[in-house]
């Protein structure tokens, strides 16, 4: 991976069903890109696969893989069992 981050799920990340709110996964994935990246590339497509539920107190790892100039995949895993909770695919368009 070209970027790795880790943190613990907090109460503010949880929805009414006591699972991680789906929007949080997108935020966590998006935040693996530095602000300067967005000066050179515009987001074109986001595809999200929700694979398992995260809960408060889970320790998570976020890994970004650079697949090509305009394509990246971010995988969010639960640390205790390495279960993939979510995969987010980003397609970018260079700024002209």
Predicted regions and their residues:
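Generic structural detector for well-ordered beta-strands
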Residues: 6-10, 49, 91
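Detector for Asparagine
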Residues: 17, 21-22, 31, 49, ...
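A conserved acidic, glycine/proline-rich C-terminal tail/linker
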Residues: 36-73
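Hot-dog-fold acyl-thioester-processing enzymes
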Residues: 1-42
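Broad hydrophobic/π-residue packing in well-ordered secondary structure
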Residues: 24-28, 50, 74
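HotDog/MaoC-like acyl-thioester-processing domains
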Residues: 1, 54-56, 65-96
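A generic structural micro-environment signature
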Residues: 15, 20, 26, 54-56, ...
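Well-ordered beta-strand positions in beta-sheet-rich domains
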Residues: 4-6, 45, 87-89
């Amino acid at each position: 991976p070209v970027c790795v981050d880790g943190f613990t799920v907090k109460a503010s990340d949880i929805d009414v069903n006591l699972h991680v709110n789906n929007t949080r996964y997108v935020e966590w994935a998006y935040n693996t890109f530095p602000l300067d990246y967005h000066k050179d590339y515009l987001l074109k497509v986001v595809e999200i696969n929700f694979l398992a539920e995260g809960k408060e107190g889970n320790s998570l790892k976020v890994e970004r893989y650079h697949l090509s100039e305009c394509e990246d995949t971010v995988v969010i895993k639960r640390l205790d069992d390495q279960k993939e909770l979510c995969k987010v695919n980003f397609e970018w368009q260079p700024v002209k």
